[in-house]
Design a protein with these regions (language model features):
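Positively charged n-region of N-terminal signal peptides that target proteins for export
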Residues: 1-6
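Bacterial N-terminal signal peptides
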Residues: 7-16
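N-terminal signal peptide c-region/cleavage motif recognized by signal peptidases
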Residues: 18-20
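Early extracytoplasmic/domain-onset interaction patches
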Residues: 25-51
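Short, hydrophobic/aromatic beta-strand segments
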Residues: 44, 57-61, 134-140
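A mature extracytoplasmic/lumenal domain signature
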Residues: 49-55, 126, 145
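Structured domain cores in non-transmembrane regions
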Residues: 55-129
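Mature, soluble, non-transmembrane domains
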Residues: 97-199
Length: 199
């Protein structure tokens, strides 16, 4: 039965990407964001995505194989390979802009899944290694599904920082990005904007 469900999902996902019909969200995500700083700028992003109760129930049913209420490292690896790795083609629903430059999001590290109060949270790191200079110090970070199958309530209410935080004075705010409007022009994504200056 499980294999049949995964096969059906595999058949349906391409239709979601190419269908011209108006979509509406089927999955909802409450995000948290941490920005890891390095000696030269931004090393990468830590996403923590908590899914709605219905999608969480599916994750638990399908991937908590020993029914202990946890997603082990082995179970998380299986989940990633079968139900998340395909988002690599879409930058893991993450856009990063530095001035006019679109920073490619191509790799994911340290994927894990936590179950708490019957809700599943994906945590993962996106390595970026973005150097910052006084002339080019502003970075925009967005997370959204352009096809609107999944609604990510981004930006989060707060942003965390880790890594070489003592080396930088950080300012952050939010801003709409009209150039990235999607869903037939109805939705304008909101970015987290950070500005880094050596402390």
């Amino acid at each position: 039965m499980k294999n049949m469900i995964l096969i059906l999902l595999g058949l349906l996902v391409p239709l979601v990407w190419i269908s011209p019909c108006p979509a509406h969200p089927h999955v909802f995500v409450e995000p948290e964001l941490e920005i890891e700083l390095g000696e030269d700028g931004v090393k990468g992003l830590w996403h923590h995505w908590t899914f709605d109760e219905y999608f969480s129930a599916w994750i638990i049913e399908e991937f908590d194989q020993n029914k202990d209420g946890l997603i082990s490292t082995q179970e998380a690896e299986k989940l990633y390979n079968e139900a998340f790795k395909n988002l690599e083609k879409f930058g893991f629903w993450t856009r990063v802009l530095k001035g006019d430059e679109n920073i490619p999001v191509t790799r994911l590290e340290e994927f894990s899944v936590e179950i708490k109060d019957n809700l599943a949270t994906y945590s993962f790191f996106l390595p970026l290694d973005i150097p910052v200079t006084p002339e080019n110090k502003d970075i925009l970070i967005l997370a959204y599904d352009e096809d609107y199958y999944c609604q990510i309530f981004f930006p989060p209410g707060d942003v965390g920082f880790r890594g070489d935080t003592s080396k930088w004075d950080v300012e952050y705010s939010t801003q709409k990005v009209p150039d990235l409007t999607y869903y037939f022009g109805f939705i304008t994504p909101v970015a987290v904007r950070i500005s880094l200056n050596p402390s």
